[in-house]
């Protein structure tokens, strides 16, 4: 028969492993009596443009032009404000406090509601500017091309709003989506077949201050990325579907340079986009390296 040692009580175990009783200190425990270092005013030599909290995980509700029309996803927030040189620090707890208030009030994340949130953030912090950046996975239903077998895909979305007192909001939208690319050179020189691979398209689009946004910015950016690739990805494919996807890719060969330029053309035609950056990266199936292209364009500065 096994012999069992009788364990000491929980408090005794904790003390056994090093826990000690709290000491009675001399510093105040009431908030009103505590020294507030952040509010000490004097010259600290430099203004700070962005100070706040980053990597804040929080659930958000979003809407989508593609099914599911409404979904809750896990977002990552960066919330910052400016700090003049005569202030030592900010009250950072107010940033996450406001996020919790919006969450409790059933916040649906959109550029309109993010504008309101960012402006209120600046007012709560008593500063002249604030920036909120949000990243989250967006899920959408996709059917296979022939048998229409449905499954969920996702792309990573980026939203950013900057508020400056007495100035228009500065807004930016972004997406990182996966696509299929088939090599034109491989197709041209080979007797049969061509190497293809999965690629990543990342887009960042500056939103024109006077533009009316579409019903779903996410869908516009996804279309720009996928419709210019060799083929789209699918969560579920049966043999007839796989044949269709493979042949579609063969009919639409794309260098990484081609993909960047074609996406740029689509973004150029979107009235709500004032400037954009595009990154295309192919995980080459016949190389150990990636093929890479980056394209930047501003409608106000650059010419075609």
Curated annotation (Swiss-Prot):
Site feature location: May be catalytically important: 183
EC number: 3.5.4.16
Gene3D superfamilies (UniProt xref): Urate Oxidase
Induction comment from the UniProt entry of this chain: Repressed by zinc, via zur.
Pathway: Cofactor biosynthesis; 7,8-dihydroneopterin triphosphate biosynthesis; 7,8-dihydroneopterin triphosphate from GTP: step 1/1
GO molecular function: GTP cyclohydrolase activity; GTP cyclohydrolase I activity
Short name of one Pfam family: GCHY-1
Class of enzymatic activity (EC top level): hydrolase
Reaction(s) catalysed by this chain's protein: GTP + H2O = 7,8-dihydroneopterin 3'-triphosphate + formate + H(+)
Example GO biological process: tetrahydrofolate biosynthetic process
UniProt keyword list: Hydrolase
Top-level taxon of origin: Bacteria
Alphabetized HAMAP family for the sequence: GTP_cyclohydrol_B (MF_01527_B)
Similarity annotation: Belongs to the GTP cyclohydrolase IV family.
Function statement: Converts GTP to 7,8-dihydroneopterin triphosphate.
NCBIfam families: PRK13674.1-1
Identification of the protein by name: GTP cyclohydrolase FolE2
Species per Swiss-Prot/TrEMBL record: Bacillus subtilis (strain 168)
Gene name of the record: folE2
